Amino acid sequence: MATAQPSQVRQKYDTNCDAAINSHITLELYTSYLYLSMAFYFNRDDVALENFFRYFLRLSDDKMEHAQKLMRLQNLRGGHICLHDIRKPECQGWESGLVAMESAFHLEKNVNQSLLDLYQLAVEKGDPQLCHFLESHYLHEQVKTIKELGGYVSNLRKICSPEAGLAEYLFDKLTLGGRVKET
């Protein structure tokens, strides 16, 4: 295997930032993979919550797009894309919409922390281009996603009980159904 040649376009792009972006790409891919698992759980015939399916499928697509955007940045800046193994989701059956939404909420907070750490590294390494990229494409969107999921979790907690099948069905149709059609 040939050793990679140094990039001729690389300028003031610290190797630590390069490595941190590769780590964040892995996190975005894992998140996409996990949301795909959630989506198709809700698409099963014995679960049949169509709008949960659509919602998590859209989140999966968004996370894949985020990973690809970071890969394009790596190439633009003269970095080297180094893909890592994507671990298997710990949970395969999501039990309920509430459990899935809570998992998504905590996952998005982890993604946000990774982005904040990456941003801080870019500041420390004096990389205004990376700071601007993260501000323009990720940070605000991430906060909006956390807020949205937090609201969904709060609403589901209010309406869910041990036998909350009807409440979950109504949440799927009325809340997520309207949300999916807007996008």
Swiss-Prot record:
<dbReference type="InterPro" id="IPR009040">
    <property type="entry name" value="Ferritin-like_diiron"/>
</dbReference>
<dbReference type="GO" id="GO:0005737">
    <property type="term" value="C:cytoplasm"/>
</dbReference>
<feature type="domain" description="Ferritin-like diiron">
    <location>
        <begin position="11"/>
        <end position="160"/>
    </location>
</feature>
<dbReference type="Pfam" id="PF00210">
    <property type="entry name" value="Ferritin"/>
</dbReference>
<feature type="binding site">
    <location>
        <position position="28"/>
    </location>
    <ligand>
        <name>Fe cation</name>
    </ligand>
</feature>
<dbReference type="GO" id="GO:0008198">
    <property type="term" value="F:ferrous iron binding"/>
</dbReference>
<keyword id="KW-0479">Metal-binding</keyword>
<feature type="binding site">
    <location>
        <position position="142"/>
    </location>
    <ligand>
        <name>Fe cation</name>
    </ligand>
</feature>
<keyword id="KW-0409">Iron storage</keyword>
<protein>
    <recommendedName>
        <fullName>Ferritin heavy polypeptide-like 17</fullName>
    </recommendedName>
</protein>
<feature type="binding site">
    <location>
        <position position="66"/>
    </location>
    <ligand>
        <name>Fe cation</name>
    </ligand>
</feature>
<dbReference type="InterPro" id="IPR001519">
    <property type="entry name" value="Ferritin"/>
</dbReference>
<dbReference type="InterPro" id="IPR014034">
    <property type="entry name" value="Ferritin_CS"/>
</dbReference>
<dbReference type="InterPro" id="IPR012347">
    <property type="entry name" value="Ferritin-like"/>
</dbReference>
<dbReference type="GO" id="GO:0008199">
    <property type="term" value="F:ferric iron binding"/>
</dbReference>
<dbReference type="InterPro" id="IPR009078">
    <property type="entry name" value="Ferritin-like_SF"/>
</dbReference>
<comment type="similarity">
    <text>Belongs to the ferritin family.</text>
</comment>
<keyword id="KW-0408">Iron</keyword>
<dbReference type="InterPro" id="IPR008331">
    <property type="entry name" value="Ferritin_DPS_dom"/>
</dbReference>
<feature type="binding site">
    <location>
        <position position="108"/>
    </location>
    <ligand>
        <name>Fe cation</name>
    </ligand>
</feature>
<dbReference type="GO" id="GO:0006826">
    <property type="term" value="P:iron ion transport"/>
</dbReference>
<dbReference type="GO" id="GO:0006879">
    <property type="term" value="P:intracellular iron ion homeostasis"/>
</dbReference>
